[in-house]
Amino acid sequence: MSIKEWFEDKRKITALLKNSVERDSKDANETEKNKNKSIDYAKIKKLWAQCDNCENLLYLRFLRENQSVCKECGYYLQMNSSDRIELLIDRDTWRPMDEDMYTLDVLQFYSENEPSHSDNLNSEDESYKDHITFYQIETGLTDAIQTGIGQLNGLTIALGVMDFQFMGGSMGSVVGEKITRLIERATAESLPLIMVCASGGARMQEGSFSLMQMAKIASALYIHQKEKKLLYISILTSPTTGGVTASFGMLGDIIIAEPKAYIAFAGKRVIEQTLGQKVIEDFQVTEHLFGHGLFDLIVPRNLLKGVLSELFWFYVLRSSL
């Protein structure tokens, strides 16, 4: 190799190394930019929410003050269980029950096709236990319901509030057991009972253990309502579907629904495929169902506590006669 060829090869190698360094630097910058975007998005998510109906951005602080109702279009956004409890229960009177109850993966359920929910769960090999852990971290709850005893305008009640943010409010063995224990305590202490429903139905990862909860809860309610003659009020919020609708959701002595809530057993597409015909739009919305006698009341959120208070005091007065 001549000196000229040696210098030419050295120049080419230097150029290649320079391009490689520049490319690595560019990739690092892109990664940093994406990281910053992710951080910014996380910050935005903690401060703002988007209306599902009109798509306006809503400042979370003002949204909570307005009970998660969009000021622009009046659409009812989903409320988490803690906000619901704050809405209904008098300050400093809430006593939670069974907070130490955790779900076990009895069936060792495993699905390669389930989508990931976060960067922490980016594997195709996510187990049911992984999903439970993710939602526990994300929501601060142990499962998809909070139960407890509290006072509503001075009257002691038993309250269960489902949380759709935890695996779509699906009902598994823990949710069913917590509801059953709440009903049994309300029965033992002669307390009126409220259940706030928000659920996609039975939790498929628990199979028959999940479906069994429907019968177990219904049996506990039978004793509470029929044998002990105690009041049970069911509040249906959007969405309430599947096994929850087919069990305790529709077993209330009084059934209350929020305006424009989606309430169903099976979805529109499933019904159309089963019947082989089209169904009308919005036939599973509160107002349409109310017109066909499925509910007793449609109550806006800002009036709910007052309406419940009147119903309970009327019940107490009637019971004392």
From Swiss-Prot:
Protein's UniProt keywords contain Signal: no
Molecular function per GO: acetyl-CoA carboxylase activity; ATP binding; carboxyl- or carbamoyltransferase activity; zinc ion binding
Cofactors required: Zn(2+)
Predominant place of localization: plastid
Keywords: ATP-binding, Chloroplast, Fatty acid biosynthesis, Fatty acid metabolism, Lipid biosynthesis, Lipid metabolism, Metal-binding, Nucleotide-binding, Plastid, Transferase, Zinc, Zinc-finger
InterPro entries xrefs: AcCoA_carboxyl_beta, Acetyl_CoA_COase_Trfase_b_su, ClpP/crotonase-like_dom_sf, COA_CT_N
Free-text cofactor note: Binds 1 zinc ion per subunit.
Its EC number(s): 2.1.3.15
Subcellular location: Plastid, Chloroplast stroma
Binding site for Zn(2+): C51, C54, C70, C73
Keyword flag Coiled coil: no
GO CC field: acetyl-CoA carboxylase complex; chloroplast stroma
Domain CoA carboxyltransferase N-terminal: 47-321
Residue ranges covered by zinc fingers (C4-type): 51-73
Pathway given in the UniProt record: Lipid metabolism; malonyl-CoA biosynthesis; malonyl-CoA from acetyl-CoA: step 1/1
Pfam families: Carboxyl_trans
SUPFAM superfamilies: ClpP/crotonase
Reactions catalysed: N(6)-carboxybiotinyl-L-lysyl-[protein] + acetyl-CoA = N(6)-biotinyl-L-lysyl-[protein] + malonyl-CoA
GO BP, sorted A to Z: fatty acid biosynthetic process; malonyl-CoA biosynthetic process
Enzyme class: transferase
NCBIfam families listed in its UniProt record: accD
Function: Component of the acetyl coenzyme A carboxylase (ACC) complex. Biotin carboxylase (BC) catalyzes the carboxylation of biotin on its carrier protein (BCCP) and then the CO(2) group is transferred by the transcarboxylase to acetyl-CoA to form malonyl-CoA.
Self-association state and partner proteins as the record states: Acetyl-CoA carboxylase is a heterohexamer composed of biotin carboxyl carrier protein, biotin carboxylase and 2 subunits each of ACCase subunit alpha and ACCase plastid-coded subunit beta (accD).
Protein family (similarity comment): Belongs to the AccD/PCCB family.
Name the UniProt record assigns to this protein: Acetyl-coenzyme A carboxylase carboxyl transferase subunit beta, chloroplastic
Organism this protein belongs to: Pinus thunbergii (Japanese black pine)
